[in-house]
């Protein structure tokens, strides 16, 4: 588990923005991919959502019929979860697995109940893109669990790195179902911090007086906030991208990133 944090040999990195350019996280991931590719080679695998079609393909993904072919042919995944494997067209040209996750919508009540019982994640107040993010995260985690079993040799140390609240439920799934895989969680900005600013409240003027749980209830952000907080507290390693965001996490999530 946490021993795998040091000198890992296999790295899975999951984000909604793998091969899916939405915002700044895409830039963060694509910038570091070249360095990680030199370190891990074909043991670096990015996992992203398959939100594409033949009519609207990803301009950043080149599918391969040979990469991880044996695993794909023999992978045991829940019905409806499918993958496409290829290369992400960024510096380093890393392997990417795109995951089709729509089938998990029908099972969301089961998973939400499980996450409440195990980690006290409150999905009762979910709305908007919460279901989409969680379905993807769970499917990605199932893929990571399956693929890591195929790739790993006896002495391999595996890390699964999850970015943002949208992948938090995947981290919790790995924590519960594949505890030998070390987990890293990175937030690029807290969901409740974004909501405070989005509601025209002065985040930094009254920063030390904000309580994340209280503000989540006030702004109807309980689900995203509780998921993000649970992921941060349960990860083997919690990180962020700047000191100011680390301060935000410490105040609103009640845990200081490394």
Each PLM stretch: what is its role?
Residues 1-258:
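Catalytic cores of nucleotide-sugar-dependent glycosyltransferases that transfer UDP/GDP/TDP-activated
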């Amino acid at each position: 588990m946490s021993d795998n944090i040091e000198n890992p040999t296999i790295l899975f990195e999951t984000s909604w923005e793998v091969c899916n350019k939405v915002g700044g996280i895409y830039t963060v991931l694509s910038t570091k991919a070249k360095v990680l590719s030199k370190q891990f080679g074909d043991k670096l695998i990015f996992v992203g959502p398959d939100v594409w079609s033949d009519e609207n393909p990803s301009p950043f993904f080149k599918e391969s019929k040979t990469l991880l072919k044996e695993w794909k042919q023999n992978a045991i995944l829940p019905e409806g979860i499918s993958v496409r494997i290829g290369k992400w067209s960024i510096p380093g040209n890393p392997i990417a697995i795109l995951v089709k996750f729509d089938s998990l919508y029908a099972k969301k009540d089961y998973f939400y109940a499980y996450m409440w019982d195990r980690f006290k994640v409150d999905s009762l107040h979910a709305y908007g893109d919460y279901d989409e993010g969680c379905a993807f995260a769970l499917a990605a985690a199932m893929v990571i669990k399956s693929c890591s079993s195929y790739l790993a040799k006896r002495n391999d140390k595996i890390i699964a790195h999850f970015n943002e609240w949208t992948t938090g439920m995947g981290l919790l799934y790995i924590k519960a179902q594949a505890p030998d895989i070390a987990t890293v969680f990175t937030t690029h900005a807290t969901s409740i911090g974004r909501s405070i600013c989005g509601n025209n409240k002065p985040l930094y003027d009254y920063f030390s007086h904000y309580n994340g749980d209280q503000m989540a209830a006030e702004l109807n952000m309980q689900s995203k906030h509780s998921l993000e907080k649970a992921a941060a507290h349960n990860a083997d390693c919690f990180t962020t991208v700047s000191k100011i965001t680390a301060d935000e996490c410490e105040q609103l999530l009640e845990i200081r990133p490394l």
